[in-house]
UniProtKB/Swiss-Prot annotation:
<feature type="binding site">
    <location>
        <position position="229"/>
    </location>
    <ligand>
        <name>Mg(2+)</name>
    </ligand>
</feature>
<dbReference type="GO" id="GO:0006518">
    <property type="term" value="P:peptide metabolic process"/>
</dbReference>
<dbReference type="GO" id="GO:0016855">
    <property type="term" value="F:racemase and epimerase activity, acting on amino acids and derivatives"/>
</dbReference>
<feature type="binding site">
    <location>
        <position position="251"/>
    </location>
    <ligand>
        <name>substrate</name>
    </ligand>
</feature>
<feature type="binding site">
    <location>
        <position position="178"/>
    </location>
    <ligand>
        <name>Mg(2+)</name>
    </ligand>
</feature>
<protein>
    <recommendedName>
        <fullName>L-Ala-D/L-amino acid epimerase</fullName>
        <ecNumber>5.1.1.-</ecNumber>
    </recommendedName>
</protein>
<comment type="function">
    <text>Catalyzes the epimerization of D-Ala-D-Ala to D-Ala-L-Ala. Has broad substrate specificity and catalyzes the epimerization of a variety of dipeptides containing an N-terminal Ala followed by Ser, Thr, Val, Met, His, Phe or Trp (in vitro).</text>
</comment>
<comment type="similarity">
    <text>Belongs to the mandelate racemase/muconate lactonizing enzyme family.</text>
</comment>
<keyword id="KW-0413">Isomerase</keyword>
<dbReference type="InterPro" id="IPR036849">
    <property type="entry name" value="Enolase-like_C_sf"/>
</dbReference>
<dbReference type="InterPro" id="IPR013342">
    <property type="entry name" value="Mandelate_racemase_C"/>
</dbReference>
<keyword id="KW-0479">Metal-binding</keyword>
<feature type="binding site">
    <location>
        <position position="204"/>
    </location>
    <ligand>
        <name>Mg(2+)</name>
    </ligand>
</feature>
<dbReference type="InterPro" id="IPR013341">
    <property type="entry name" value="Mandelate_racemase_N_dom"/>
</dbReference>
<dbReference type="InterPro" id="IPR034593">
    <property type="entry name" value="DgoD-like"/>
</dbReference>
<dbReference type="InterPro" id="IPR034603">
    <property type="entry name" value="Dipeptide_epimerase"/>
</dbReference>
<dbReference type="GO" id="GO:0016854">
    <property type="term" value="F:racemase and epimerase activity"/>
</dbReference>
């Protein structure tokens, strides 16, 4: 098996702002694994919040190149378990590698990934489209630029309720709110009341990740469901979220790929938690991998490639929130 690493700098359509940062370009690592005439592709993007850079990921993968290239024809579970000890401090690199291996494995088997997992896709949820923090006029213009059935609105400002009130005047779409750890306990509970009146479906990670007492209080008193994001990073976190959140948002780059992400979703479902997968600002390589988990999800946020000025791959397509699969096997990706 041959490992190929590529670095890209993805240009965004608009400056993207959340409560922590603003970006115009998104650095991205694409991993390709070649074997027996097949190629599998995976992706992970840089993330300043987690101190992840593309050169760092490449360096971590280069260190174990021989181990990766000598591990072939194992199931993705066995492959992940073998590689995890070497990359346990770089889950982003592990994710890109795991996505590529799952893609390659399914292509060798002659199946789409969701077919290999025996999933049926008739009830797949629609993806939301993210509106980053900006002036209200800019946020309204972003909505008008792309009419969509569900919007995820990034908040964490002093005018959050006013922003949502103003946006609501311009659309009947479902709203989801992501405060990116920007609120306190009372603020979250009070905001939930106001936001429910404004047609908000749920709140995502309103408070700091480690505020477990606060999460429990909000869980009891919020009139809207609350979904964990930063509080649910790796497999061990799912059980902690029980009785503290109504659901979990799994990010593949944070947990180490599709292999552990799939297990996290299965555990969440057993615990009666709502399930969601979220994306980063990334290309169709990463987004196409997420698509194969859709049959297991209540919600999904996989609009990352829609935020790009120019994509670097083809794969799944998204129109008006509805995800359509590529005709190709594996995750269905082709690099442009």
């Amino acid at each position: 098996m041959k490992l190929i690493l590529r670095e890209y700098n993805l240009k965004l359509k608009h400056t993207f702002t959340i409560s922590r940062e603003s970006i115009d370009f998104q650095p991205s690592l694409i991993v390709e694994l070649q074997s027996e005439g097949f190629s599998g592709f995976g992706e992970a993007t840089s993330n300043p919040y987690y101190n992840i850079t593309v050169p760092m990921m490449m360096q971590d993968l280069e260190k174990i190149r021989s181990i990766i290239e000598d591990t072939e024809n194992e199931t993705p579970d066995v492959f992940w378990a073998k590689i995890h000890p070497y990359l346990k401090n770089d889950m982003f690199a592990l994710c890109a590698l795991d996505l590529a291996y799952n893609d390659l494995y399914a292509r060798k088997k002659g199946k789409k990934l969701y077919e290999l997992w025996n999933y049926t896709t008739e009830r797949n949820p629609m993806t939301d489209y993210t509106i980053g923090i900006a002036s209200i006029d800019k946020m309204v213009s972003k909505m008008q630029e792309l009419p969509w059935p569900i919007y995820k609105i990034k908040l964490g400002t002093k005018e959050d309720i006013e922003i949502v009130k103003e946006l609501r005047k311009h659309t009947n779409a479902v709203f989801r709110i992501d405060a990116n750890c920007g609120w306190g306990v009372e603020e979250t509970i009070n905001n939930s009341v106001e936001l429910k009146k404004l047609g908000v479906e749920f709140l995502e990670q309103p408070m700091k990740a480690d505020n477990w007492e606060g999460h429990k209080e909000v869980f009891k008193h919020s009139v809207l469901p609350v979904i964990a994001d930063e509080s649910c990073i790796i497999e061990e976190d799912v059980a902690k979220c029980f009785n503290h959140f109504h659901g979990v948002n799994v990010k593949l780059v944070k947990c180490g790929g599709l292999t552990p992400g799939k297990r996290m979703i299965e555990e969440a479902k057993k615990l009666g938690l709502r399930t969601m997968v979220g994306c980063m600002t990334e290309s169709t390589v990463g987004i196409s991998a997420i698509a194969h988990l859709l049959p297991q999800l209540d919600y999904v946020d996989m609009d990352g490639a829609l935020l790009l000025a120019e994509d670097i791959a083809t794969g799944v397509t998204i129109k008006d929130g509805v995800v359509s699969y590529s005709n190709l096997n594996g995750t269905g990706v082709t690099l442009l």
